[in-house]
């Protein structure tokens, strides 16, 4: 009976009920012969739960290969060189041996099979009985890559990509349809487990008859080609002999049997391996984009109404519904949202009714992107668990089947689509940070998020915004498709080809750029959080100071009688509540700044309604203005500086609201674990130094835990519609 599914929802499987491991007929008899149901079932549940599973799998110490259950997170873990051991299922040994034996038997019987007795591609009309020599020549002529003088020339694939390719190729060959010895697969696994990585060329594959050229260099190490090189555990280049010694492979180099060279090179493993790594990161970045959009709402004092479930339920798209629900969860109970609600109650008719698109439509923007990432992820997981060489050996029917599973179109299409997604996420981040640094839009934060005392000598995130524009422009360029640039190749035999690896490489570039953007934006959001904290303390100090000065100066007349100006205090406090503190904080008593102008305006307005009392020195409010302002000038700058000093020392009276928010784990990670601090022009440290800390942490997978911690108590459903 056929095995349906693999735990990843890929719907891959193989039958093993016939003794030789190849129950091909059974593949067509199960209840989902077209695999559509399996593909649909793979998308059940939330995207966040899927990312949680990926993160858990990524940390497991062992990856056990049996041919049909490999996940992109396992590929990413092995590729990253983590302490992960690769094991091969002993159950696969029998079916792998059966297909290998079939090739040798058919060769002995004189059966004519492509790549076993024939030439390759457009020259398959040629025939030979020297099956081993044919495989050796295959590897030789495919070693057509260019490496330059060394790694500094940038013409080699990253070792992580090669490790991913090795893992995927072993997995696909374990299904027993390829005619290769189990011992060769064990040797590749030994190279992986001992961190010995063949050097592959960066370019030279069209991912049509598989990734022929790069995969031939893995085969070159296994057969001991003199031009083959590997990177040892210590990072040095070694030849094939030393590679075998370091990997503990005994018995010497392999003498290829018929079909074995073709089995190694005629597959999509390099493209699908890199695609797996790319999608592992893309899935995490998608969740990050949802969470930081919610943090953006917090620091912008946005209106959380945009996450209301009814809005998104009526749109029907699951990605949008989930994105909104995640943001709703972050914002529900947020201390920032409670404060923002009070602010919005002040003069509501004088403020915009709704937020700009970068905030208000972020679920609608991100939702379809998440759906595409999920679809691409499942497509690649099907690919890395597929049999993708040619011909396929069907032992049960005693035949070699000539087809084209080596065509890497699922990779090219998935990577083109993923790159569009990454560009769109980057565009949203750029729109959000552009609002955040602009004091015309950011609801009272200082221009450029400048954190210092003197805005004329502190330009904050101005350089960062320029860098973000650069990143975003390059990212949008990379969004252009690769797969429409096909060239007919190999004497017009490979006249359509997927360009899967090229597309995956471009998508890997896009991931790196989006991580640069994410790192920059995350530090900017933390800066905004701290500025809101400073703002709240400054405003409290200003209100207290103005109130105290008003009581001292405006309450009593010269002879101790109650003065009409005592009624001004309430309106003076309203001015402070309505005025952005950073509009005057660098010089709070400046006559050119709005605070002093509007405080004076309050006194003038009260004086104008004071009537005949203004004619008397003892009851004139006008006569109090100078005394009030002089007292304020003597007191307020000291109080403002005191708040600044307390902020620098971490001793402010009002604590930082972020500690009461579900977004706190990300803030804490940046500020405390990474030590990326509050930026000001008064410090020597540059913005890029702090951005780099976050970028390095992302590359080291350290952001995953604090990101998921922000959503640890989400139950996977939107809040009820009440």
Curated annotation (Swiss-Prot):
Disulfide bonds: none
InterPro entries the record matches: Aromatic_Lyase, Fumarase/histidase_N, L-Aspartase-like, Phe/His_NH3-lyase_AS, Phe_NH3-lyase, Phe_NH3-lyase_shielding_dom_sf
Annotated catalysed reactions: L-tyrosine = (E)-4-coumarate + NH4(+); L-phenylalanine = (E)-cinnamate + NH4(+)
PTM summary: Contains an active site 4-methylidene-imidazol-5-one (MIO), which is formed autocatalytically by cyclization and dehydration of residues Ser-Ser-Gly.
Top-level division of the source organism's lineage: Eukaryota
Subcellular location: Cytoplasm
Active-site residues, as the UniProt record annotates them: 114
Thermal effects: Optimum temperature is 50 degrees Celsius.
Residues annotated for (E)-cinnamate binding in this entry: 266, 354, 360, 390, 462, 490, 493
A Pfam family: Lyase_aromatic
Noted pH dependence of activity: Optimum pH is 7.9-8.5.
Cross-link 5-imidazolinone (Ser-Gly): residue positions: 208-210
Signal peptide from the UniProt entry: none
Outcome, altering residue 218 to P: Higher binding affinity for L-phenylalanine (L-Phe) and decrease catalytic efficiency
Effect of residue 490 to N: Higher binding affinity for L-phenylalanine (L-Phe) and decrease catalytic efficiency
Physiological role: Key enzyme of plant metabolism catalyzing the first reaction in the biosynthesis from L-phenylalanine of a wide variety of natural products based on the phenylpropane skeleton. Can use L-phenylalanine (L-Phe) as substrate more efficiently than L-tyrosine (L-Tyr). Promotes drought tolerance by inducing the biosynthesis and accumulation of salicylic acid (SA) and lignin.
Binding partners and assembly: Homotetramer.
Protein name (Swiss-Prot/TrEMBL): Phenylalanine/tyrosine ammonia-lyase 1
Species in which this protein is naturally found: Fritillaria unibracteata (Sichuan fritillary)
């Amino acid at each position: 009976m056929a095995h349906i599914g693999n735990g990843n929802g890929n719907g891959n499987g193989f039958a093993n009920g016939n003794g030789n491991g190849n129950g091909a007929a059974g593949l067509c008899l199960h209840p989902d012969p077209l695999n559509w149901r399996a593909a649909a079932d793979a998308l059940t549940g939330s995207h966040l739960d899927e990312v949680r599973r990926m993160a858990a799998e990524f940390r497991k110490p062992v990856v056990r290969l049996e041919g049909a259950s490999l996940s992109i997170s396992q590929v990413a873990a092995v590729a990253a060189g983590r302490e992960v051991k690769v094991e091969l299922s002993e159950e696969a040994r029998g079916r792998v041996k059966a297909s290998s034996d079939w090739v040798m038997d058919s060769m002995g019987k004189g059966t004519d099979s492509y790549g076993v007795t024939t030439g390759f591609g457009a020259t398959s009309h040629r025939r030979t009985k020297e099956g081993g020599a044919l495989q050796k020549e295959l590897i030789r002529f495919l070693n057509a890559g260019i490496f330059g003088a060394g790694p500094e020339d940038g013409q080699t694939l990253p070792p992580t990509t090669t490790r991913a390719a090795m893992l995927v190729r072993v997995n696909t060959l374990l299904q027993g349809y390829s005619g290769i010895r189990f011992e060769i697969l064990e040797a590749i696994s030994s190279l992986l487990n001992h961190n010995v990585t063949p050097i592959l060329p960066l370019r030279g594959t069209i991912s049509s008859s598989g990734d022929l050229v790069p995969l031939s260099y893995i085969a070159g190490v296994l057969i001991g080609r003199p031009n083959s090189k590997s990177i040892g555990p210590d990072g040095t280049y070694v030849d094939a002999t030393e590679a075998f010694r370091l990997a503990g492979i005994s018995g010497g180099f392999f003498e290829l049997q018929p079909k074995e060279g073709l089995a190694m090179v005629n597959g999509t493993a390099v493209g699908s391996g890199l695609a797996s790594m790319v999608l592992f990161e893309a899935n995490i970045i998608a969740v990050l984009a949802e969470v930081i959009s919610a943090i953006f709402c917090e620091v912008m004092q946005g209106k959380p109404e945009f996450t209301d479930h009814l809005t998104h339920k009526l749109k029907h798209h699951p990605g949008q519904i989930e994105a909104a629900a995640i943001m709703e969860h972050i914002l529900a109970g947020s201390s920032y949202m409670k404060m923002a609600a009070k602010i919005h109650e002040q003069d509501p008719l004088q403020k915009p009714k709704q937020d700009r698109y970068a905030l208000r439509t972020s679920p609608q923007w991100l939702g379809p992107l998440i759906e595409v990432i999920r679809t691409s992820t499942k497509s690649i997981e099907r690919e890395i668990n597929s049999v993708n060489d040619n011909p396929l050996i069907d032992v049960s029917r005693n035949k070699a089947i000539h087809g084209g599973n080596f065509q890497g179109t699922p990779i090219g299409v998935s990577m083109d689509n993923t790159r569009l997604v990454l560009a769109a996420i980057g565009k949203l981040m750029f729109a959000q940070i552009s609002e955040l640094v602009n004091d015309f839009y950011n609801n009272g934060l200082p221009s450029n998020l400048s954190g210092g005392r003197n805005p004329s000598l502190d330009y904050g995130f101005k350089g960062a915004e320029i860098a973000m524009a650069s990143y975003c422009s390059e990212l949008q360029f990379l969004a252009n498709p690769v797969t429409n640039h096909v060239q007919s190749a190999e004497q017009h035999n490979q006249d359509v080809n997927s360009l899967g690896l090229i597309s995956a490489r471009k998508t890997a570039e896009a991931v790196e750029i989006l991580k640069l953007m994410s790192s920059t934006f995350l530090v900017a959001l933390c800066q905004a959080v701290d500025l809101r904290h400073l703002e709240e303390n400054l405003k409290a100090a200003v209100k207290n100071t103005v109130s105290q000065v008003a009581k001292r100066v405006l309450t009593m007349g010269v002879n101790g009688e109650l003065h009409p100006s005592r009624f001004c205090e309430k309106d003076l406090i309203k001015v402070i509540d309505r005025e952005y503190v950073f509009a005057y904080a660098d010089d709070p008593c400046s006559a050119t700044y709005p605070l002093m102008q509007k405080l004076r305006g309050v006194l003038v307005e009260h004086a104008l309604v004071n009537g005949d009392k203004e004619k008397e020195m003892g009851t004139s409010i006008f006569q109090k203005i100078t005394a009030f302002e002089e007292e304020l000038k003597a007191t307020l700058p000291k109080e403002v500086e005191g708040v600044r000093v307390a902020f620098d020392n971490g001793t402010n009276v009002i604590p930082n609201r972020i500690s009461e928010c579900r977004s706190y784990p990300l803030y804490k990670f940046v500020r405390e674990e990474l030590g990326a601090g509050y930026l000001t022009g008064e410090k020597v440290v540059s913005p890029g130094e702090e951005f780099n800390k976050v970028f390095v942490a992302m590359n080291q997978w350290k952001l995953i835990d604090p990101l998921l911690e922000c959503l640890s108590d989400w139950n996977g459903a939107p809040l009820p519609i009440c």
